[in-house]
């Protein structure tokens, strides 16, 4: 544009927002600044944020067309330049008021980035300078000159990728040196007076006026660039090189510019040189580069490409050229729009990245080397993605990347770049991410060996407050992670404080230190900060030691309790840690916690000192008489270590030796070894005289001969007597009156020793019977002596076990209305109050005999029967037994591989069999059998007879088909009567790599199948889930369908499996299970690909036999309900759901196949009549919440069970009336309210009639498995869940005519009773850690529950 434009004063000044009234694709967001030349704004577009530059048109005759064409051509030329961001659009249609330029918005330019924390380090500055030269080189090779390179026009993304933007070819090339108006108008947009323009672009004012005078028209201030000025005013490459040199110099001088306007004009005339600013550039090669680029003579400046070659290996490391530039360029492409994708790509390439940037796998080089510092550039890519990650897998992958790269990064990068994002992840919504973020944060901070001055208070002011909430997190795995890492966190915080103190002392002792005045009373500051640090850590340690979950306490003790002692000091270790640890022995139900106490007590006692021995003595004695033998072993080991460290006083040692010596004949091998270990350590600690005078008397009863070297374990073990028999020991220990038993055994011993003349038989018949039982098990006199030696231990152990039982009964008694019949000695008896209904004679007869049929020859040949027609045959062996037992006709294998009943036509069901290739005998005695006399009857009568026969057969087939429907079973193997699973984990299967979507069990329960988002279907052998095998693996894996497998179902009565993927594929698989478990095989039989645009992918599917057809019914996301006849490979029926009611999420088919019900994302439940294929009725949930899963009610034919989004609601609806009849409500919200304080939902349902008392299993997003007793709702309970699950009760109430069963959390924990299923006395985290997606059951020798979760875990429970 012409220079005269700068002198035009606008007649009207409008706000930049006013210019958006005429453009419709862009919505004004905010102003980015305005100058006389351009008004700049940020606008919203459907593809993201854009920058809009508005040029107000004061003169309508301005020739803007040529400029627009030039910008369009520039955009095309720079299309492949990855470091250039040209204007994407130029517009001049805004009511002719203004011309507009549009480009993508980038938040930061280089000017802002230089002064923004975290500040750029040396390698990042080199990387940006390298990219600036690369961008200039890309533009020049494309035939484009920029014309206005400055820090404001160099955009820097959050991952330090440079974009050169705002190409200014429309700005004047030459400026008058004596008139700053043009410079201010076109180039000084920031008003900083900073000048980046090459000196040759300034010309003498008089010459400037003379050269351009003939081109100007006084009435037109803007000239057409097609004139001679375009040739004379052409931008040169050297001009851009000068501007780029100024930008690079400002980058390396922390924002100090090389020139302002006056200095540049002086530099042009040789009166000024920016030597003072250049000297601030510490790196010699960079300083030399800038000096060459800003040379006053344009001819002395090289091309950008030449500078890149010249500085290769000098200013710019070799790795920029060979790896970083091509690797980072892929993230600038549009194909990597997702942060999750970037993280996964980097994780995949991590090995190659480390090899290229570090040259080795372990960080053994010095930190200052450029190769390793190149990782900082990669770290910026990772950190730029962290806040926008969506998926749990991506977040965990990012944390894994950080952990791998952290040892190779500098302290400043770890504290300034990594730590804030780890604290951000500690507030993530996913518990696994929070837990892993805490672990990663701890490991990263442990790598910091020096503390920068500006980070001296990072622990008390930033890190510890940032993770404080995790100590009381709702998820147990997060608190576990905190307990696991708090010792290392405290240790690292103390090291930080000591490093700061050491630095302060060094500064205080340094007489040349200018900052000595800032350091006052370092010792006082240290003591104060140490006390504050102790208080912060102590608060969290006490919280964790008081956690309701024992596993959290156990984890804290097992992971660094000794380091916490060192952190707190001796006094607080005794007052805080030891005082809380002692209370753990009071938990009689969790031996793991008690065992962890003895594992940890040695380190604590070693730090506190021998003074603690008096406190610990009764605790150790209690451990020696624990009811759990593992705890005894751990107590023995703790005593051995404490004795070895000299922490026990000598009187205590002898007292323990007397208690431990009887363990030398204990039946447990580990306890014997532990006792031997303690005895040998004591023998080494005391004098020889004490060994023989005080120690040997304890050992004599348990060794076969005297020994000298008691301190040697092998010697002592070799002379030990045989231990007491395990069976005798256990039987005696379990006896109720163990005191009387030992009294009698003691009398027998006295009689053997001659102290008593005679030992009368016991008066108590129970003791006599007990003694008789012990003698029958092989108890000898020697065994009696060993039992008497263990008397004290057995008495205490028996009492401890009795206390556990008493406590459990105490807890049981607190349950309202619960009576323990076993404790009262009442024997249960069962009497049938209702007699089973007798079937009519004609129905019983139909179960024993079958109707023969005149199947035509074509059908017979199709199904393999070659017998001549009309020949009665005997019923094949096994056929009528099958009919009697199942009420179903014998089945045949069709050409499609599906077991289906045979039929006489496509409409009329017929009950026949091809077993042994013989038809069955007739069922009706009145049936006219073909005979020889028919030959003599006329043809007409013969045809009439055949017609009558056909009609009878048709009637009979319809009757049997109806009977088959009436006798349809809900499931082939229902749970046994009174089945109440205890929530014991049997198998933990982690073969799937992504979310498991469905579980299905075969009809005979020998197999079950799972499908997952990882694209695989896995087949499992149910028999192997009983815990009898050492390993449990899937027997088959199928992964050839592609995409994510969303649903599957077994075909009724067969080992054929139908699966569906989100890529539109539906496949039928055959499983050869006859050879299990040796060589099972799986092979596809049929498949079809759905039209993704018309139908979409399958969301749910079911299979059923309708007699004449074997139908696979599936529903798609676009509303199609299709019945695929697997015999004919065609559609038996197709229904179309109206999407106005919402997308189909689930559907269920009536057991008699008369109707089906679909559930939608808008809460609608719609019924279809399967006979006429017409919609019947539609009902909607009051809150229009999404229907997650549908199932038919096992008892009421018109009821459906619907799991609804939110509040864990499961409701049962009468589809005939549209009423909600029964609701299960596991939420704290008021029942049937439309509020959702609980976002949890049920994702999986299993329902069974269970012998007339229906049961329901539900599982979902709260990771709990609930057992609902629909007949007696108060008996419902949580089978398994997270370890932090409080105890709950269930109450029934009527609300607005709907029966509601509500789950209410109890205020106090109630211990499990004997007859209430429970998870056992152990509090291990066996539950799912992610959303449970499905639940099913199978029966082998007992009933099992199988569940699957979103993290790919499959668990089996009983």
From Swiss-Prot:
Catalytic activities: L-seryl-[protein] + ATP = O-phospho-L-seryl-[protein] + ADP + H(+); L-threonyl-[protein] + ATP = O-phospho-L-threonyl-[protein] + ADP + H(+)
Record's compositionally biased regions (Basic and acidic residues): 1315-1326
Residue positions where Phosphothreonine is found in the record: 1316
InterPro entries: ARM-like (IPR011989), ARM-type_fold (IPR016024), HEAT_type_2 (IPR021133), Kinase-like_dom_sf (IPR011009), Prot_kinase_dom (IPR000719), Ser/Thr_kinase_AS (IPR008271), Vps15-like (IPR045162), VPS15-like_hel (IPR055231)
Active site: 148 (proton acceptor)
Modified residue annotations for Phosphoserine: 808, 813, 853, 865
Tissues/organs with expression: Ubiquitously expressed.
Subcellular location: Late endosome; Cytoplasmic vesicle, Autophagosome; Membrane
Family the entry assigns: Belongs to the protein kinase superfamily. Ser/Thr protein kinase family.
This protein's name: Phosphoinositide 3-kinase regulatory subunit 4
Organism: Homo sapiens (Human)
């Amino acid at each position: 544009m012409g220079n005269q434009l700068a002198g035009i004063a606008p007649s009207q000044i409008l706000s930049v927002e006013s210019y958006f009234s005429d453009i419709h694709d862009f919505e004004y967001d905010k102003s980015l600044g305005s100058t006389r030349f351009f008004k700049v704004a940020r606008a919203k577009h459907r593809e993201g944020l854009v920058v809009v530059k508005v040029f107000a048109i004061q003169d309508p005759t301005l020739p803007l067309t040529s400029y627009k064409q030039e910008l369009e051509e520039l955009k095309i030329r720079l299309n492949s330049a990855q470091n250039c961001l040209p204007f994407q659009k130029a517009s001049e249609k805004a009511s002719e008021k203004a011309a507009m330029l549009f480009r993508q918005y980038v938040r930061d330019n280089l000017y802002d980035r230089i002064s923004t924390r975290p500040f750029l380090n040396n390698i990042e500055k080199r990387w940006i300078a390298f990219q600036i030269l690369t961008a200039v080189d890309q533009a020049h090779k494309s035939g484009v000159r920029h014309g206005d390179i400055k820090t404001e026009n160099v955009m820097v993304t959050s991952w330090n990728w440079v974009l050169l933007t705002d190409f200014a070819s429309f700005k004047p090339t030459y400026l008058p040196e004596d008139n700053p108006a043009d410079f201010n108008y076109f180039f000084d947009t920031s008003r900083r007076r900073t000048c980046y323009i090459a000196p040759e672009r300034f010309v003498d004012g008089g010459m400037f006026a003379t050269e351009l005078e003939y081109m100007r028209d006084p009435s037109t201030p803007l000239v057409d660039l097609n004139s001679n000025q375009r040739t004379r005013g052409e931008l040169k490459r050297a001009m851009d090189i000068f501007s780029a040199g100024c930008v690079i110099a400002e980058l390396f001088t922390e924002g100090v510019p090389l020139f302002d306007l006056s200095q540049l004009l002086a530099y042009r005339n040789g009166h000024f040189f920016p030597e003072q600013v250049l000297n601030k550039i510490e790196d010699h090669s960079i300083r030399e580069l800038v000096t060459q680029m800003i040379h006053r003579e344009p001819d002395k400046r090289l091309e950008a490409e030449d500078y890149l070659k010249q500085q290769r290996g000098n200013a710019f490391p070799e790795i920029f050229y060979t790896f970083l530039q091509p690797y980072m360029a892929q993230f600038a492409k549009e194909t990597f729009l997702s942060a999750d994708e970037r993280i996964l790509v980097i994780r995949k390439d991590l090995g190659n990245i480390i090899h290229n940037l570090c040259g080795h796998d372990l960080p053994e080089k010095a930190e200052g080397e450029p190769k390793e510092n190149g990782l900082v550039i990669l770290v910026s890519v990772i950190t730029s993605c962290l806040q926008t990650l969506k998926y749990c897998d991506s977040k965990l992958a990012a944390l894994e990347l950080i952990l791998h790269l952290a040892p190779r990064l500098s302290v400043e990068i770890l504290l300034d770049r990594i730590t804030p994002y780890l604290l951000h992840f500690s507030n993530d919504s996913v518990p696994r991410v929070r837990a892993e973020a805490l672990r990663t944060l701890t490991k990263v901070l442990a790598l910091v060996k020096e503390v920068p001055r500006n980070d001296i208070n990072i622990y008390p002011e930033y890190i510890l407050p940032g993770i404080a909430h995790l100590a009381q997190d709702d998820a147990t795995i997060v608190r576990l992670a905190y307990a696991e890492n708090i010792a290392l966190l405290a240790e690292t915080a103390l090291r930080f404080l000591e490093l700061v103190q050491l630095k302060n002392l060094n500064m205080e002792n340094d007489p040349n230190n200018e900052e000595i005045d800032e350091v006052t009373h370092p010792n006082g500051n240290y003591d104060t900060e140490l006390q504050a640090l102790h208080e912060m850590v102590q608060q969290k340690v006490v919280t964790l030691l008081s956690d309701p979950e024992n596993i959290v306490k156990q984890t804290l003790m097992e992971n660094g309790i000794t380091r916490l002692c060192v952190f707190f000091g001796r006094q607080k270790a005794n007052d805080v840690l030891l005082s809380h640890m002692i209370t753990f022995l009071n938990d009689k139900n969790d031996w793991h916690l008690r065992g962890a106490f003895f594992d940890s007590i040695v380190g604590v006692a070693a730090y506190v000192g021998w003074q603690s021995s008096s406190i610990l003595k009764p605790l150790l004695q209690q451990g020696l008489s624990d009811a759990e033998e593992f705890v005894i072993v751990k107590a023995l080991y703790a005593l051995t270590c404490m004795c070895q460290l000299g922490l026990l006083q000598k009187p205590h040692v002898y007292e323990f030796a007397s208690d431990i010596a009887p363990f030398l004949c204990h039946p447990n091998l580990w306890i014997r070894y532990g006792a031997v270990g303690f005895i040998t350590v004591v023998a080494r600690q005391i004098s020889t005289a004490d060994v023989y005078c005080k120690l040997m008397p304890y050992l004599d009863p348990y060794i076969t001969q005297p020994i000298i070297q008691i301190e040697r374990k092998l010697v002592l073990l070799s002379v030990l007597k045989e231990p007491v028999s395990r069976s005798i020991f256990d039987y005696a220990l379990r006896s109720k009156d163990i005191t009387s038993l030992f009294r009698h055994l003691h009398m027998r011993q006295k009689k053997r020793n001659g102290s008593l003349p005679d030992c009368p038989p016991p008066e108590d018949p129970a003791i006599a019977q007990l003694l008789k039982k012990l003698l029958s098990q092989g108890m000898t006199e020697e065994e009696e002596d060993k039992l008497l030696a263990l008397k004290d231990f057995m008495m205490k152990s028996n009492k401890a076990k009795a206390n556990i039982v008493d406590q459990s009964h105490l807890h049981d008694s607190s349950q309202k209305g619960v009576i323990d019949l076993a404790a009262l000695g009442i024997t249960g008896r069962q009497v049938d109050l209702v007699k089973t209904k007798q079937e009519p004679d004609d129905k019983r007869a139909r179960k024993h005999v079958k109707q023969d049929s005149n199947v035509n020859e074509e059908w017979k040949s199709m199904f393999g029967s070659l017998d001549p027609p009309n020949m009665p045959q005997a019923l094949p062996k096994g056929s009528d037994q099958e009919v009697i037992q199942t009420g179903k006709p014998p089945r045949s294998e069709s050409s499609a591989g599906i077991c289906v009943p045979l039929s006489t036509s496509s409409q009329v069901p017929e009950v026949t069999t091809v077993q042994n290739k013989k038809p069955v005998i007739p069922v009706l005695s009145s049936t006219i059998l073909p005979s020889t006399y028919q030959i003599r009857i006329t043809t007409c009568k013969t045809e009439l007879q055949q017609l009558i026969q056909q009609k009878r057969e048709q009637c009979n087939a319809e009757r049997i088909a109806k009977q088959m429907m009436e006798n349809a079973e809900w499931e082939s193997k229902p749970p046994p009567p009174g089945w109440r699973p205890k929530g014991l984990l049997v198998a933990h299967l982690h073969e799937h790599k992504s979310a498991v979507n469905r579980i299905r069990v075969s009809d005979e329960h020998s197999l079950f199948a799972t499908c997952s988002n990882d694209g695989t279907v896995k087949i499992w052998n149910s028999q192997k889930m009983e815990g009898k095998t050492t390993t449990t693996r899937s027997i088959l894996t199928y992964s050839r369908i592609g995409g994510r497998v969303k649903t599957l179902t077994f075909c009724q009565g067969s080992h054929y499996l139908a699966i569906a993927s989100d890529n539109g594929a539906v496949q039928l698989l055959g499983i050869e299970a006859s050879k299990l478990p040796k060589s099972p095989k799986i092979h596809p039989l049929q498949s079809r690909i759905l039209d993704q645009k018309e139908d979409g992918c399958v969301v749910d599917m079911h299979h059923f036999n309708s007699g004449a057809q074997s139908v696979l019914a599936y529903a798609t996301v676009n509303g199609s309900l299709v019945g695929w006849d697997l015999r004919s490979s065609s559609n038996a029926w197709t229904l179309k759901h109206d999407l106005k009611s919402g997308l189909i999420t689930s559907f269920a088919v009536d057991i008699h196949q008369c109707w089906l019900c679909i559930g939608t994302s808008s809460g609608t439940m719609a019924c279809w009549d399967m006979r006429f294929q017409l919609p019947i009725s539609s009902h909607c949930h009051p809150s229009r919440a999404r229907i997650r899963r549908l199932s038919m009610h096992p008892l009421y034919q018109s009821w459906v069970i619907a799991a609804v989004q939110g509040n864990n609601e499961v409701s049962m609806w009468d589809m005939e009336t549209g009423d909600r009849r029964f609701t299960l409500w596991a939420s704290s919200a008021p029942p049937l309210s439309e509020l959702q304080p609980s976002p949890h939902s049920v994702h999986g349902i299993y329902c069974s009639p269970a012998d007339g008392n229906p049961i329901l299993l539900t599982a979902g997003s709260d990771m709990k498995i609930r057992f609902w007793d629909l007949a007696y709702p108060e008996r419902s309970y949580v089978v398994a869940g997270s370890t932090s699950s409080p105890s709950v009760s269930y109450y029934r109430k009527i609300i607005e005519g709907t029966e509601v069963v509500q789950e209410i959390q109890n205020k106090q924990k109630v211990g499990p009773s004997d007859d209430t299923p429970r998870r056992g006395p152990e509090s291990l985290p066996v539950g799912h850690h992610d959303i449970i997606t499905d639940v099913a059951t199978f029966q082998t020798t007992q009933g099992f529950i199988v569940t699957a979760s979103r993290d790919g875990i499959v668990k089996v429970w009983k």
